[in-house]
Amino acid sequence: AMAWVTYVQNGASHWCFDGYYRKSPANYIPTGTNYYYCCAASYCIKGFLSRMPMCKEAAALTIVMLDTMAQRQNEYGYWATEPGSEWLQGDYGIGPGFYDTRFNTDLLEIYIKAARKFGKGMFDETINRYLGFFSQIADTSHISTESGGWLIPDYWHPSEITAPHTSLNHQAAECLALYH
């Protein structure tokens, strides 16, 4: 249980029974001193995964946490950021429950690494559901470049009014995840 004790004493993010919670940023709705939201990018799982096989409980914690996150995957195939964002709502009409490519791609990378370590098709269904969603969003929401490349918007919501921007850091992370 040393891995868990070390994690619990590290930082302001917390694992709860249904996912990884981070303090809500000032521009999220709701926000405040003691407001947290469930974040798709469950970085503590990455930490446990990296401690295998030196830490005997790391494998069990990784599997349980990834199973919990798989249950949070919505009907579209992504892990929603549940609170609203003032600027996404104001600039693009994107409300609560939006898709954030960065957080989802970070979680995808964790699933890919875990699937490679554990083998036996573990997490394939979750990975494939997400990749199906991502392929659909890329196909329907991309912005084409002059040379035929695709820029995938950083955020998405089923009721979005205006397609948002594409950031290099989000795009590069997506390309690396697809490569892996």
Label each residue range with its predicted role.
Residues 123, 127, 167-174:
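Hydrophobic alpha-helical segments and helix-packing faces
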Residues 2-34, 59-81, 122-148, 180:
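Long, well-ordered core segments of solenoidal/helical folds
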Residues 49, 61, 66, 88, ...:
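Generic detector of leucine side chains in alpha-helical contexts
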Residues 67-123:
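Substrate-binding cleft of extracellular glycoside hydrolase catalytic domains
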Residues 42-59, 105-120, 172-180:
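Well-ordered alpha-helical scaffold segments within catalytic/enzyme domains
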Residues 20-49, 88-108, 155-172:
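Solvent-exposed loop and edge beta-strand segments that line ligand/cofactor-binding
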